[in-house]
Each structure stands twice: as structure tokens, then as C-alpha cells.
């Protein structure tokens, strides 16, 4: 299988802990023995801090976006270092470069690409471009809920939903002040338009990522730490 993984910076680069990078690298190395794997790293807290500083100095939003992209690529560079010889040595800066890099047989790692797009959106577009078998959004949330569980204690978690239902949930959450959607709206639209199979999962524990993508990914069976998004009945 070809898997595109959006690995949130908030879980990968938390406290810039080198041991975390090494743990994720070990898991990704194992997954790559069974699947072709391309990873997009997020910026996390470091990106938010740098962007906040830039805004405080009056920087425009495009400049802030480029700063965020730079931070995602720094996280990608650290993950490549953790992967050692199993990681593709260069960071693709566009979708064409990424499509060529996957032929290397190594774990390909990249960051953001275009201002105005989150790394979730980049991952979804890349998954569509490469006709990936699965898009995985690895985050700190254990799946998709009927509403933001941080704001609504009655929110219900889904084991599996359709892309169309995902769009409805995401747009409803995004409309509410203070609420945060588990999937970027652009990424959700990409998933819908190309009927892409996707998994949103809590990957704060790297071993969970290995268990799900290493063994259960082909079964599409319910997972306690995530939600499958599929157009299949």
C-alpha cells in the first residue's frame, strides 16, 4: 500500500524532544517494511510561536505562512536525521519532487508546500496526486466527533463516516467560535472530491501508529484511537 501520513507537529516535536523523534522514526521504519510511506510533518508549537512573533512585528499573512512552512521543514529535517539511512535525504518542496522520491524505496519526509495550506491539506492533495491507498492524519485527537469534544461534553465519536458527513461536521465545527475541527476544511474537501480512504487517529503514542498502520490498516476495522473515513459501504 501507498500511505501518505500527516504527522502533527504538536505530537512529533513536543518540547523538541529528540527521543520522540527517534521513537517515531523507529515506528515509521517498521511501517515502511510493509508499505510505501510518505510523511508530511507539521510545525507544532514552534511554528505557532514564530508566526506569533512575526505577526507582533506587523508581518503580512503570506510571510507568516512561509515562516510556518520553514518550521515544518525543520521538523522534517530532524525526522530524516532520526531515520538515518532509511530516510530519503532530501526534503521534497513540491508534489512532483515527492512523486519521484517515493521510487527511492526510503521513507520520504517533507513539510509544507504552499502559503495558505495546512500540512493536513498538503497531505490530502499529495494523496490525491499520488493516488495513495490511504491518507492518515496523526494528531492528538482520537478521531472525528459529532462536534468539538473540548466544547461539547455530549459529542459522539464515530468509528467510521463518509467523506460527505465529514464535510458537514467540519464546516459546522469551524463555524463555532473557539471550536477546532479534527480535519482541516481543505483536506476534508479533497478527501470528499476524490473519495479518498482516510484515517484520523490519536498518535501521541508512536507505538499506536505502528500497530494500526502496520497490521490493521488493510482491515478497516474499528480502532479505539481513531475514525475511518471512507466512501465504501
UniProtKB/Swiss-Prot annotation:
Supply the InterPro entries for this chain: AceGlu_kinase-like_sf, Asp/Glu/Uridylate_kinase, Uridylate_kinase, Uridylate_kinase_arch/spir
- Compartments reported by the entry: Cytoplasm
Which residues are noted in the entry as UMP-binding?
43, 65, 113-119
What are its GO cellular component terms? Answer: cytoplasm
Residues bound to ATP:
9-10, 44, 48, 139, 145, 148
What does the record give as EC number? 2.7.4.22
Main localization of the protein? cytoplasm
Q: In which pathway does it act?
A: Pyrimidine metabolism; CTP biosynthesis via de novo pathway; UDP from UMP (UMPK route): step 1/1
Q: Which SUPFAM superfamilies match?
A: Carbamate kinase-like
Write out the catalysed reaction.
UMP + ATP = UDP + ADP
**Superkingdom field:** Archaea
> What is known about regulation of its activity?
Inhibited by UTP.
Q: Name one GO biological process term.
A: UDP biosynthetic process
Q: What does this protein do?
A: Catalyzes the reversible phosphorylation of UMP to UDP.
Tell me, how does this one assemble?
Homohexamer.
Report what the protein is called.
Uridylate kinase
Q: Which organism is it from?
A: Methanosarcina acetivorans (strain ATCC 35395 / DSM 2834 / JCM 12185 / C2A)
